[in-house]
Structure formats: C-alpha cells, structure tokens
C-alpha cells in the first residue's frame, strides 16, 4: 500500500456559501485536495452545485442521492480519486454514508459479501455522527457506536471514522464492544467569531488524520493584508475580483477605492505579489537575528504534553552548519521530567554553548517553558543557559513587521510549505503529538506511541525553521517611494497582518 496521504477538503455548506467564486477556487487550489466533502447531514443542493462548478475533483455529498446512492465509495485509480463499485478491492478506500441509519445495511452487505472490504484501510465518513453526554453522569457516548462496531467487525480491515458532527481536529480512539475505532472530526473547526471555518484533512493510510483549520477570510481578496469584508466588496464593485487583479492595479488606483489609504493600498499590493510569487519580502533594513560567529543559528523545537505542560518530552536541535540533527526523547518514564532536560543541557552546553538558538514563536512558548523546567529540574545549569543567545524568528518577521511571508497563515508549516519546503509528511500536528504522549502517560505503554514518526515531526519543524530563515535571509527588500508604488507597489507596514 502506498504511504501517500489522501487529501480531503471538508467544506460545510455555510462555508461554501461564504466564498465567492474566486475565493472558492482559491481555497481549493491552496488545499489541493483529492476530493471535496460536504459533511452536512441535510441536503445542500445549492452549495453542492456551487462547489462542483468551481472544482475539477470529486465532490461528495450523498444526502442528495437517490435509491442505491446512500453509500458512495471512492479510491485512488491511476493516481486520481475515483468512484468505485462495491466489488472493487483497493488497498485504501473512502466510504461515505448518508447517515448513521445506513450503517447496519452497510455491515450486512459486507457480511454477505455484497460489498468487498478494502485490503488495508477504510476511511468511513459519517455525516451527523457525534458524541452525546449524559447530563447526570457526564458519561460520553458515541452516537451509532454499536452500528460502527458491527461495520468494523464485518470488514475486519482497520477502519478510521470521520464524524461530521465533531469538529476537525477532534480525535479519540473509541472502544466499541471490544473493538477499537479511531474517530476524527470532519465538521467545521472551532471558529473565529462569525467567520465560517472549514478544514483540509490529510488522511494517512496508517490510520491517522491531521486537520488544518481554515477560515473563509483567508481566501480570495480577503487573503490580502488590509482587506476586510467591506473593502473586499468595494474592490469587487470596482471590478477587482481576484488577487491577480489587485496585483496588476497601480497603487494610485487602489487608493481611489473608498476607505483605502495609501498605506493599505501598498500593503495589499505587496501582499498580492508575495502570494503570487511565493517569495518573502524584506520590509525593513533590520538585520536577521545575529550569531556569535560565522556559523548559522541552530534551530530548536520542543514537544510537550499540552499548552500547560507537565513535561517536555522531546527536544530537537538542527544544526545547518553540518546538516546534523540531535533529539532527546523521554520514552520510558514520563514521571521524571528532569531526565530529558539534563540530558539536553549536558549535550548542548558541552558542544553548542557558543551558538545562537533560533525558534518559531519561541518567546511565547519554547523559551519560557524551557526556562521553567531548567529552574525546577536542572538549576545548576540555569545561569549557563541564560548566557545562551536565543532569538525568535516569528517575532522578528511577523510581530516586529520586518518581513512579509507567503503563507496563508503565519504558522511555521504553512510558511515553510509556501516557500517550497518538502517535509517528511508525517500527517501529525502539534495537538496530535501532545495527545499521543498524554495517552502514553495514562497507560504507561510505550507501544501506544509511534516514536519514530513523532521524532520525524519534530525534526521537520527544526528543518522547516531553517528553510524559512534562509529564504528571508536571501529575500529582496522593497523601498517605499511614490514612484515604486505607482509602478509596482510596496509595503510600508503590517500592523494588521
């Protein structure tokens, strides 16, 4: 079976309606999915038609199906996601049902041989599937759990469930009648106010699903810095429907749009260029974080058991000077957080104490947590660690507004991918690594964690950080002058980026 992940775009009807044609095409182009799923449990014909009109990949919404269409099946055929029949035997398939009411019939069809299971893994999409909580006992129950257990027993092939009523990013391994079924959410992720959200899902054949939440405001005209809903409407009224239109319009003409200042015009124009070219833009003459010698900074990342950690269970350091990577992982005793801290400091202070350390958003998380754990578990090294030069590239580029980056968000993996970084494709997120270690802490069973995969995830972050640093280091600068902006646009500042 191929290890290539299946990429699905889970797009609710509400999100589809909030995206105009240009923004919808932009979202699909950005996510580059194998298919688009509408996880709504009710028929949404207009949203379905809107999405089908905008994309060339399969669009799946079985709520509109007629007799015999209550279950649809897809698998990769010659590299493309294609509808396949019940007698096909792909290694990895996607079954989508109209509702949980269909699950018993699905199980019966598999039991009788009317439907043949996949060879290695089935991804089962169930709109309307969610979790109910008893108000008295507070016990949580997965709706249609018995039916899912029956499907899993009948198929025998490992199954991963995508639940339409649970938000993208949700994950729990449910034990259903002595059968364990991993359940992930594919509904709209937690939102940002009234802005509709949706998610790109990377489904790894081994069974895990990584969700990348997205907002409708990240696509189309609103993807550009300085453009809100009102400005987007005013630009469209002037015939500017896309970022390409903004990029090709002189700044002096953008200023003519009601409510657009020259600074905002420069901002949106420069951002359009950055997103189009994929090249970062240096906005100031500020130097990048300095080093103590001619060697580049070492890139550091930590993994914890949550945002209020009780342990730093993995520390990774990538040294671009000799392309080496060193990791420290607590695989045996999560009750002793000091062991990994001391091991890391023994190595780092002996071999790299004169090097500059670089992180992404480290001033907000990595450095404070490291300092807290050092003070508690290795106080004899606290003063030596204080002498280490530490910098935060995210602060320098984004919060201090020294650079404009091509990612749709300023998350490291998003920025690095936009800059051409090709990682290990682990299918993991920071939340999943934390959840995996929490499970290990609860059970004490190290076999519950795919250690090598989680180590690759941390190494990926370290190497991605260096890739972003090098891209910014080599990026051009844009001067802000009337002549330059009128002929090509510049960027004065990024206060609201």
Where are the regions that the model predicts?
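Long, highly charged low-complexity segments
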Residues: 6-8, 248, 256-298, 302
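Conserved DEDDh/DEDDy metal-dependent 3′-5′ exonuclease domain
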Residues: 5-142, 152, 327-417
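Acidic, Mg2+-coordinating catalytic module of metal-dependent nucleases/exonucleases
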Residues: 103-201, 405, 411-489
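Low-complexity, acidic/Ser/Thr- and charged residue-rich accessory regions of DNA metabolism proteins
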Residues: 490-497
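RNase H-like nuclease fold core
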Residues: 297-330
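Acidic active-site catalytic centers that drive phospho-/nucleotidyl reactions
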Residues: 301-303, 392, 461
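Long non-globular sequence segments
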Residues: 189-192, 201-211, 233
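Helix-hairpin-helix
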Residues: 214-268
